UniProtKB/Swiss-Prot annotation:
UniProt membrane topology term: Peripheral membrane protein
Domain of life per record: Bacteria
Record-given protein name: Protein CyaE
Function statement: CyaE is necessary for transport of calmodulin-sensitive adenylate cyclase-hemolysin (cyclolysin).
Amino acid sequence: MAAVQVRRRGRALALALWAGFALSVGGGVRARDGLATPPAFEGQAAPAVSWPCPPPADRLDDLALLEAIDLALCHSPALRQGWARIKARSAEVGLARAPYYPSVALSAGRSAQRRSTGLGEDGVRNNVMAVTLAWRLFDSGARSAALRAAQAQLDEAAQAYGAVLQDKLAEVVGAYYEAATARQALHTAVEDTEIARRSASIAARRARAGLDSHGDVLHAQAALERARLAQAQAEGAQARALAGLAQVLGVDPATPIVLAPGPLAPQRIEDRELAQWLRDARQRHPAIKAAQAGLAAATAQVDVARATDMPTVDLSLGHYRNSSENVSVFAGSSRSVSASLNLRIPLFDGFARRHRIQGARAEVQRQEALLDQARLATGAAVARAYADLRAARASHEASLRWLKAARAAYESDLRRYEAGVGGVAELLRAQSDWLSARQRHVLYAAQLRTRALALLAAAGELGRSTIDGDPPKE
């Protein structure tokens, strides 16, 4: 009869346990699942440390911009560090969720005792087995506050990862644009050398015909050598730009890199007023979102400090079995089931709780200052990038007008010179002006792309859909 009552009590306790467990898991505070993959880069997950990168290539031919981005992200140590931090924060969310569940432990033991007397020897063997369960039912909100703090820290890590991703994208695209601009500048320098060679050839031919002096030929030859010097400098600039691109991509500096053929397309960007850019940046920039998540985590830590050393209620269940046997005679066994409900009310802790709350509030103030700093820095960066983009647009338009006028003037003076009307000095001045206009136009076209990129990066809007630059497909 007693055994039946024990089993009934055990079933009743089990039912109460599972009912409370369902209420706790179903109605209590629950953390969202930890991130299983890194934050997506507009449909394509960013590479993580566990993802294998492609094997090193002997050379990179026809390297397009988006291919360069993928390669650089795969080899980026900063992104691998950020992703590892996300995984660590995700594990902390799981740790913060763990106190909502009961803990179950199984223990077993065996002991032997032998005794010798004048009447002989006897021995006793004891076998002990126990299953215990401990479950915190009430903790004055400490678990929920800790869970909110862990979730906010995970959000902060994800947003910080996004900020690092923005910086890396800007670095890669900037290096690619620099290499493409250097290639275009070299192409222009080669054409300029051919133009100067043509003028020198015409001057030599006219000198042989007695139409120009030897001094005119020397002036034309000097202009040709100046063009050759500019071509040599452009070749060196291209080599330096490709070396910088290799470093950003994370490949061997000796790897030959050939960019995809064709000119870079202009970087498209929405035409918005500065006030709109600032509003959008405050809402979207990952650095601001990371600071906001850090503030949320600090605020949750204040709740954790308040709930620490507050009243708690714990449920304990235990099922024990003890059996013993004599060396010659079986002694018997016993079973027992225990249940306890414990209330703990801290009375005095040496003012530790008050100091914890003060420290948590100070951290909130620090996070508020960091958030203000992030907003100010983002706003200043957006304002500077916006002004730079406006200036770059004006410079690009002016360089285009200069290029058209200088080319028309050169072609006019060339026709006059070939017709024997103009002199070589006029032709060389027009040629120098046109070549300068060509070089400036290449520079300002590149500057317009980089300034548009800088504005997108400052506003936190850099991504696949906003990055142009690959050559148009035929």
